Amino acid sequence: MPNILITGGAGFIGNHVVRLFVNKYPEAKIVCLDLLTYAGNLANLKDVEEAPNYVFEKADICDFPTVRALLERHHITGIIHLAAES
């Protein structure tokens, strides 16, 4: 089973990608990583927050030990990187 990490998943583009993957690939575990700064909004993901294949993790992608632990804990097999400060 694939385990996909989507960084910036609560942002403008990321939330659309998260919802697409959660709904299109129910066999995959979709992990949304976002720091929830000015652009991230969990309300964007309200419709998938109870999905069995969806997990939200609040963390900074610049915090390497935290990201490494997250990758190991969720057995991530692929990453879609959309996190950015603009």
What does each model-identified segment do?
Residues 1-86:
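N-terminal Rossmann-like NAD(P)+-binding domain of SDR-like oxidoreductases, especially those catalyzing
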